Amino acid sequence: VDMGGIDGMISKYDLIPNESIRKNDRLRAYIKEVKSTPRGAQIFLSRTVNDMMIELFEMEVPEISEGVIEIKAGARDPGLRSKLAVKAKDKRIDPIGSCIGMRGARVQAVSNELNGERVDIILWDEDPAQFVINAMAPAEVSSIVVDEEKGSMDIAVEEDQLALAIGRGGQNIKLASKLTGWKLNVMSLADADDMQAKELQKTGEKLAEKLGVDAEVAGVLID
């Protein structure tokens, strides 16, 4: 890549899959590393890192560059889909609407630059469980159980929401996990109920053994 006398390099792994780049094409890319060599500075570029998407939104959305809206996190499956978590510092401002723009113009401009990558704008929340619920969009979460020790959450959804929650090839759940930093397990409500019943049974058996009472009494104590 010619950068006015400075060498810029971009590997095929840093190009968005299936995008066609020809010689002399103008290209937007993120500077991910700069190295000093005997020939001078060498710049390594990427179009697949999260920061590429974040920088594009800063260019397209004035509220972000002005500091009114803050980007809290980003996660990408380059060229296919990504999620961006945002927060407004001014409660009067709608951060999602601002990032989408009039008739979707702002988010579409970013998508076009990223070879048609679909971008979900997510509302960041300081409550980790609520943040995960938001990140699972467009799927609707019915219930969520947090295990802070394991850094995981069990997410239950209606049966007709299960495919949407998982996404094609697990894309939605993987992006939500990357975005929030939590290990996420998604299941149907029926499976969640079965799992809860088994956990209660195990707890009851342990309590009955410890107290020397039968399972029925232990069950009453748990209730």
What is each residue range found by the language model?
Residues V1-D223:
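RNA-contacting regions in translation and RNA-metabolism proteins
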